[in-house]
Amino acid sequence: MATFKDACFHYRKITKLNRELLRIGANSVWIPVSSNKIKGWCIECCQLTELTFCHGCSLAHVCQWCIQNKRCFLDNEPHLLKLRSFESPITKEKLQCIIDLYNLLFPINPGIINRFKKIVNQRKCRNEFEQSWYNQLLFPITLNAAVFKFHSREVYVFGLYEGSSSCIDLPYRIVNCIDLYDRLLLDQINFERMSSLPASLQSVYANKYFKLSRLPSMKLKQIYYSDFSKQNLINKCKIKSRIVLRNLTEFTWDSQVSLHNDVINNKEKILTALSTSSLKRFETHDLNLGRVKADIFELGHHCKPNYISSNHWQPASKVSQCRWCNVKYVFRNMDWKMESMYNELLSFIQACYKSNVNVGNCSSIESAYPLVKDMLWHSITKYIDQTIEKLFNVMNPVKVDGQQVISFHWQIDVALYIHIKMILKTETLPFAFTLNQFRSIIKGIVNQWYDVTELDYLPLCTEQTDKLVKLEEEGKISEEHELLISDSEDDD
């Protein structure tokens, strides 16, 4: 077990490049870090252990030892974890880069074997080639990878993942890319590696190689917002941001393949890039479709639809003295956009409901209450039209000129009044709404705050470091709430 970790430890003194690349946290002094009780493979040292969340991508893929290095497979610094990472599609050329990297960093030849033999022979009772003392030489070259599926793109992190574990809570799945390369050619490469080993170790090497190289691939898992840590989320002025740490270098490469070519042919450039790299802190916005869905689900769960039959003049989120309508505590850590959407939706539905249904106060039990919750839950799904129609029908619509309409003569907020006029593109509001107008207003309120067609599926922490740098230079890495405030002040 942990052959990759042992190989990094023993091979780190072979060359100058090895000293820089094979310095992993699992072989350093342990610094206590809280565990998240998620068992899986650390993609940096490849050992099977309890994982914690990465500082760079907020996903659970790093062990309690390697977390101290603050490395992520999305960095642009050419450390070992980055060199083992490739984005889809996986080609034979990329797989050859992985094989060449393993052969460069972890060679097996008579000189290496004699070097390790001398080190081991310095200690008594270790004269034989026992597996426990020569585990670093039992490093077969396989093409297994931990795959992160970020909606439309996939990132493969190659490594020697030994053992078995339940992958239910892991953000990645282990796949075998041997069929994308050449089984017989990979077998030949490993036979040549093991030919220099003593006979007692050859059988162990061969057994380990065939066991790992013939593993079936797991079914890929789509990463969802629930897979990301909330520990690095901050809430400033009801705006959620995520703190992301990435390792940067000033050197650039056209592709990952060209980076590997420099590892083989231009080692000085790699060493310079490693020695001049720095750790950069990004404060990225957390506005994405996954978080919006999670917030809307929570909002629908805590929603108090009794507000639509009440006589409260305050916005729905500000009611605090009413046992049937109080949701004030829900918005303590919720996005300001969600609160504004909730207020406008419930104020509009309240005005429509009070205009058409003879209802007393917020303690009443109404058939429309479940539909209000459903409307929130379905506000960004394909079922929104059906839910709006059901809500419209419980407001006792009447038929006028062949169309079902509801009355509208209840007081509303000035800002909401102006917003509805903009949605309907009219100078004055009518005293009756058709189903199409009612639907347009509700959808317009939702889309003003959350236009799902423009949202990314996942947080920005899943993007490559180069893209984060570019977004920061363009001023697009944070939410535009402060810009909106500045614009409104300038208009006044």
Curated annotation (Swiss-Prot):
Region described as RNA-binding: spans on this chain: 1-81
Keywords annotated in UniProt: Host cytoplasm, Host cytoskeleton, Host-virus interaction, Inhibition of host innate immune response by virus, Inhibition of host IRF3 by virus, Inhibition of host IRF7 by virus, Inhibition of host RLR pathway by virus, Interferon antiviral system evasion, Metal-binding, RNA-binding, Viral immunoevasion
Important for cytoskeleton localization: annotated segments: 82-176
The keyword Hydrolase appears for this protein: no
Localisation: Host cytoplasm, Host cytoskeleton
Region (Zinc-binding domain): 42-79
Motif (pLxIS motif): 483-486
Entry GO CC: host cell cytoplasm; host cytoskeleton
Record flagged with keyword Metal-binding: yes
HAMAP family: ROTA_NSP1
Protein name (record): Non-structural protein 1
Organism: Rotavirus A (isolate RVA/Cat/Japan/FRV64/1989/G3P5B[3]) (RV-A)
